[in-house]
Amino acid sequence: MQFPVDTHSHTVASTHAYSTIHDYLAVAKEKGIRLFATTDHGPAMKDAPHFWHFVNLRVLPRIWNGVGILRGIEANIMNEKGEIDYFGEYLSELDLVQAGFHEPVFAPADRLTHTRAMIATMESGLVDIITHPGNPAYPIDVEAVVGAAKACNVALEINNSSFTASRKGSEENCLAIARMATKLDAQLVMGSDAHVAFDLGGFDRSLAIVDAADYPRQRLLNESPMALLHFLQQRGHQHLDELIRYFRPVL
């Protein structure tokens, strides 16, 4: 099954990734992906794009050859206060703000520190999705984090790359998060975390976790473009009208 939405991809602007926006559009069209987000790493990462890269995402078309593009970022959680490395009025210009722990920016500490930082990030109201929360390098209090995600209407990502290319050993933590999300009816999303266009929409390992946790597939934000757009609209994003008009079902 090919889900039509992917919330997590990196372009050559993050120099450890290998594809352009044009590459992603071509693969999306080929695979039947209708909406994807370009979410390069926040500027605190050493090989991340400059702050201006995210400001200038406004030059991207909303829709190209039938594929919708969301202008986003995978920001870095900077500290225990939940601060991220993209801020101010420019945040409101983005369609999707994700954030997660990355070793070069936030050194692994202890379970309490990670939990506090992740919850503070969600409570800030600035972040829509927490990326790869099951990273074994950053153990968390799963019930506390998922409970906060539910309370803050923030989605937790089941990151497919965590089972293939990076963050080895994530399965147990991700399954625990997904099971708690099922129990608490918290919002999950699958992200390919593609660093090359061929991986866009690749969710096979993430979906296995979702299914093992008995989380309803129809609850995933990947289920349809409107599912994600409605979530982002609820979260206060105000520049989605063109995409909503395009993807809204005709009655």
UniProtKB/Swiss-Prot annotation:
For the biological process aspect of GO, one term held by this record is:
bacterial-type flagellum-dependent swarming motility
Pfam families found in the cross-reference section: PHP
Its required cofactor(s), as named, are:
Zn(2+)
Give its E.C. classification number: 3.1.3.-
- Quote the protein name from its UniProt record: Probable phosphatase Sama_2233
Q: Keywords in UniProt for this one?
A: Hydrolase, Metal-binding, Zinc
For the ligand (Zn(2+) 1), the binding residues are: H8, H10, E74, D193
Spell out the molecular function terms from Gene Ontology: phosphatase activity; zinc ion binding
Q: Which organism is it from?
A: Shewanella amazonensis (strain ATCC BAA-1098 / SB2B)
